[in-house]
Design a protein with these regions (language model features):
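Conserved G1/Walker A P-loop phosphate-binding module
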Residues: 1-113, 122, 147
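C-terminal-of-GTPase-core extension/linker across diverse P-loop GTPases
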Residues: 2-8, 13, 19, 148-350, ...
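Residue-level signal for pocket-adjacent positions within structured domains
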Residues: 22-32, 39-41, 46-49, 53, ...
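Short, intrinsically disordered, mixed-charge
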Residues: 24, 56, 92, 130, ...
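Conserved nucleotide-binding/hydrolysis micro-motifs of P-loop NTPases
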Residues: 24-25, 50-51, 75-77, 105-111, ...
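Amphipathic alpha-helical transducer elements in NTP-driven molecular machines
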Residues: 34, 48-51, 64-70, 84-97, ...
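Short, glycine/charged-enriched secondary-structure capping and boundary segments
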Residues: 83-86, 115-118, 219-221, 248-250
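Long, charged N-terminal accessory/stalk domains
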Residues: 90-194, 234
């Protein structure tokens, strides 16, 4: 399994159209707010050219890529944290995500209504961000009240948690998101994560653009805003993605080249998701199955083994490792071994992106 990415944003910005194009689903994408009521979930394969190159050598009976769970969450509006629009139920859906893709409308189209009557990319982005902040403030203040009562009764063990809550509240009240990387202490980090804060999730903008001058201005404004709050922007012509979704792979590739687009939206989203979540991919290769596995960057060999089965982690002995480059250069496992490129690694080995692994374990 890869990761779960929630598509969020105001109503009518292109979230469901993007979801449809990427997952090739046919959920409603109507021109009125809240046409998405329940979150729509699509599982898409993560494109990885390395699987194709490995399969040229391995010739496995089955090739299994890792996957991305894409979730189309109903449009949020100003006041959602107070129950406006479809309210808090959708803020709770966001809590389940590993990462958030925030779609912002940068295109002009008189046929598609805007909830505020006019397009302003910075304001639109800020509306959603503020709702996430308000929701987190409510969560933290409720927790703070409970802890205050226990502290007054003499429970000093909660003093550190109380201090962390106050720090987070201070950050949010200044208009900033809570940044997990600001907390290096493992115990502090564990407590912060237990709050399940929306603003602590990795998030990036998807600018839904067109080729007009006004769209370019809206995009530039969004970039300026994103830089101020340390977020990043991916440009996507969602309408174009919708048009090419039904084409076969070669026609899609030809069309993208003709339009001067380097890669489809799915690839951009996955790359950015892997980057902000700190994820890598390793492979297992054999005659029956060639498979990609997603792993948190910096994971040790037993943790990688545990991605396959908990018994592998519990009884881990050694891992046979070949880098992707060596595996390809020397024509597979046998050639890599003959040239001294197969390594035996122990429990302290930190997995690298592209490693081909075979685990030895005993339970």
């Amino acid at each position: 399994m890869g990761f779960k990415c929630g598509i969020i944003g105001l109503p009518n910005v292109g979230k469901s159209t993007l979801f449809n194009a990427i997952t090739q689903s046919s959920i409603p994408a109507e021109n009125f707010p809240f046409c998405t009521i329940e979150p729509n979930i699509g599982v898409v394969e993560v494109p990885d050219f390395r699987l194709n190159e490995l399969q040229e050598i391995v010739r496995a009976k089955k090739v299994i890529p890792t996957t991305l769970n894409l979730v189309d969450i109903a449009g949020l509006v100003k006041g959602a944290s107070n129950g406006e629009g479809l309210g808090n139920s959708f803020l709770s859906n966001i809590r389940e995500m590993n990462a958030l893709a925030h779609v912002v409308r940068c295109f002009d189209d008189n046929n598609i209504t805007h909830v505020d009557g006019e397009i302003n990319s910075t304001r639109d982005a800020e509306v959603i961000n503020l709702e996430l902040i308000f929701a987190d403030l409510e969560t933290l203040n409720k927790r703070k009240e409970k802890i205050e009562k226990k502290l007054r009764s003499g429970d000093k063990d909660l003093a550190n948690e109380f201090s962390l809550i106050e720090n987070c509240i201070k950050t949010l009240e200044s208009g900033n998101f809570v940044n997990i990387s600001d907390y290096s202490n493992k115990e502090d980090l564990k407590i912060i994560k237990s709050f399940q804060l929306l603003t602590a999730k990795p998030i990036f903008f998807i600018a839904n653009v067109s080729e007009t001058e006004s769209s370019r201005k809206n995009l530039n404004d969004l970039w300026d805003y994103a830089k101020k709050i340390n977020q990043e922007v991916i440009e996507v012509q969602i309408k174009l993605e919708e048009e090419i979704a039904s084409l076969d792979e070669q026609d899609k590739k030809d069309f993208l080249e003709l339009e001067g687009i380097e890669e489809p939206a799915l690839n951009k989203i996955i790359k950015k998701g892997y980057e902000i979540l700190g994820l890598d991919t390793f492979f297992t290769a054999g005659p029956n199955e060639l498979r990609a596995w997603t792993l948190k960057r910096g994971s040790l060999a037993p943790q990688a083994a545990g991605r396959i089965h908990t018994d592998f982690e519990r009884g881990f002995i050694k891992a046979e490792i070949i880098s992707f480059e060596d595996y390809i250069s020397f024509g597979g496992e046998a050639g890599s071994k003959e040239n001294g490129k197969l390594r035996l690694e122990g429990k302290d080995y930190i997995f690298k992106d592209g490693d081909i692994a075979h685990f030895k374990f005993n339970v």
